[in-house]
């Protein structure tokens, strides 16, 4: 039987992130310095966090979760990002391009075609 304090902490973390109510999850490659200079990746991460909050996309109604990934295994023309469940992979995720992705894809539901490197939506098994 799990420790009740651990169960409560997990429940609180799940509630805080609104898990189960998220519509999209953005993973951004940050770190390692292979696909982009580490400082550029960190700048993009800070921008993504700030803009998701400003746009109200990370709250329960916004429905977007974000995760910093160490490596998404496409080590060229980064930072690389992927938006699930859409399965849309993006290259060159600078703050300027992230703003385009935020407005077009996450707000309006239209991927930014000139930045897309792959499109592989998740499907139910």
Describe the predicted segments one by one.
Residues 1-19:
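N-terminal leader/targeting and pre-domain segments
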Residues 2-7, 23-68:
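Small-residue-enriched alpha-helical segments and adjacent helix-cap loops
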Residues 17-21, 72-74:
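Short glycine/proline-enriched loop/turn "hinge" motifs that connect secondary-structure elements
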Residues 18-20, 58-59, 82:
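Solvent-exposed alpha-helices and their adjacent loops that cap or buttress functional pockets
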Residues 34-53, 77-97, 102-104:
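Iron-sulfur (Fe-S) cluster-binding segments and ferredoxin-like electron-carrier domains
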Residues 89-125:
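C-terminal binding/interaction regions
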């Amino acid at each position: 039987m799990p420790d009740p304090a651990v169960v409560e902490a997990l429940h609180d973390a799940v509630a805080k992130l609104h898990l189960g109510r998220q519509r999209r999850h953005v993973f951004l490659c940050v770190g390692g310095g292979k696909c982009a200079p580490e400082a550029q990746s960190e700048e993009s991460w800070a921008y993504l966090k700030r803009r998701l909050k400003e746009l109200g996309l990370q709250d329960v109604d916004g429905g977007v979760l974000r995760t910093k990934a160490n490596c998404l295994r496409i080590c060229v023309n980064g930072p690389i990002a992927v938006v699930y469940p859409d399965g849309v992979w993006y290259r060159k995720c600078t703050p300027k391009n992230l703003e385009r992705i935020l407005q077009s894809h996450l707000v309006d539901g239209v991927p930014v075609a000139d930045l897309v490197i792959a499109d592989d939506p998740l499907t139910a098994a």
